[in-house]
Amino acid sequence: MSENNCSKPSFPDNAASKEYAASLDAADPLASFRDQFIIPSKANIACKRLAKPNLSPEPCIYFCGNSLGIQPKATAKYLEAQLDTWSSIGVCGHFTNLEDSPMKSWQLLAEQAAESMSKIVGADPAEVAAMGTLTANLHLLMASFYKPTATKHKILMDWKAFPSDHYAIESHIAWHNLDPKESMVLIGPDEGEYEISTDKILSYIDQHAEDAALLLLPGIQYYTGQLFDIPKITEYAKSRNLVVGWDLAHAYGNVELKLHDWNVDFAAWCTYKYGNAGPGAMAGLFVHDKHGQVDYSQGEDSPKFRHRLTGWYGGDRSVRFKMDNKFKPIPGAGGFQISNPSAIDLSCLCAALSVFDQTSVSELRRKSLKLTAYLEYLLLKDTTEDSRPFRIITPTNPEARGAQLSLLLKPGLLQGVSERLQDAGIICDKREPGVVRVAPVPLYNTYSEVWEFVQQFRAALQL
């Protein structure tokens, strides 16, 4: 994927020193953002009871933002404001904009979140909706965009899709009385490899252009951390008359996206990883403007719009409370909403987005490129491919990855390495049978933490 300043950084001879890592932190223009988050302490992550933040002054090293981001300090403030609104004015909170609240009234709150998210995914605000959860949103989008016929029914997807995506796709195929064994086409890497080349994806598109109805891929592959060339793949697939959707769970808040300009048909994402909106937080979806049009040329009572599963909250606010059972959708992605969204969930999402509103994904990406490159440099320094008991299965090309590096350990090493990292107060994700996923997040992680992680990781492997 073409990105600005995406060449791999080079490092000087003293780059492996603790002092050099500290110098990078001192020069980091985004360093102050770390103060806007609550970093779990080493004492707390070992505690067996509920604990207050900062039980001890020593923070853990949290490299698990690709699984769950940490809590912004704004979250408690936003939640308290919402609880005060509910307790003080009850149902009036739906329509009352309180002057000292950081959030709009409840009926406008989803739009507030969607506007901020649109900047993160490169879309017009009307093309984004804050709603539901990732898999539920994928179901809703596939209900609208997956229209199989007898001859054009296949879905092209990732060979190692996150299981929830696999289940969702499989169930939609079965819903149409089709056989998943015939209608699911898994695109995988060459034997012994983990990276899927863009050329291979394009070749699958060519091979199935006549019988595929949908291409649905992850923007970033959750296991390997590979960032796919979204614009190139999208353009090519659409030239072959495929509908194109993307699961951006690991791309949202991680890499630059331009969904509108790339002409993506639809996309969905969760907000609790790099988005920091909390466990199981409200998700988001994108529907390109051309699919969200509402045509009233045949009269106000006969709107024409793309078929979707509907609910009252997708209806235009001007008629939402008329209760006349005449559905008039909100133009754009908002028309795909189903139910009244949780104001509590939206509070957590808006709190997380308030941090992103202070910067840009391009600035975060610039730091992320250097942070992850530094991690890679330290991991590989003074080793050879034969001497290393691990392999980085994430692409070495910075244009083909986000913040995450996936480290595939030799058989039998995962448990011992995981225990060593945990004892050192380092939180990162492990995936059986042998992968450690490490994700330094530019909003709150430091170069010094990268340095310390590598010391502990190498010690665990006796390097």
Curated annotation (Swiss-Prot):
Biochemical pathway: Amino-acid degradation; L-kynurenine degradation; L-alanine and anthranilate from L-kynurenine: step 1/1; Cofactor biosynthesis; NAD(+) biosynthesis; quinolinate from L-kynurenine: step 2/3
N6-(pyridoxal phosphate)lysine found at: K273
Subcellular location: Cytoplasm
GO CC annotation terms, alphabetical: cytoplasm
A family per Pfam: Aminotran_5
EC id: 3.7.1.3
Entry cofactors: pyridoxal 5'-phosphate
Keywords: Cytoplasm, Hydrolase, Pyridine nucleotide biosynthesis, Pyridoxal phosphate
SUPFAM superfamilies the record matches: PLP-dependent transferases
Cystine crosslinks: none
Catalytic activity: L-kynurenine + H2O = anthranilate + L-alanine + H(+); 3-hydroxy-L-kynurenine + H2O = 3-hydroxyanthranilate + L-alanine + H(+)
GO biological process, one term: L-kynurenine catabolic process
Record-listed pyridoxal 5'-phosphate binding positions: L134, T135, F162, P163, S164, D165, D247, H250, Y272, W312, N340
Major enzyme class: hydrolase
GO MF term set: kynureninase activity; pyridoxal phosphate binding
Main location: cytoplasm
Entry annotated with the keyword Cytoplasm: yes
Subunit structure: Homodimer.
Family per record: Belongs to the kynureninase family.
PANTHER family on file: KYNURENINASE (PTHR14084), KYNURENINASE 2 (PTHR14084:SF2)
Protein role: Catalyzes the cleavage of L-kynurenine (L-Kyn) and L-3-hydroxykynurenine (L-3OHKyn) into anthranilic acid (AA) and 3-hydroxyanthranilic acid (3-OHAA), respectively.
Protein name according to UniProt: Kynureninase 2
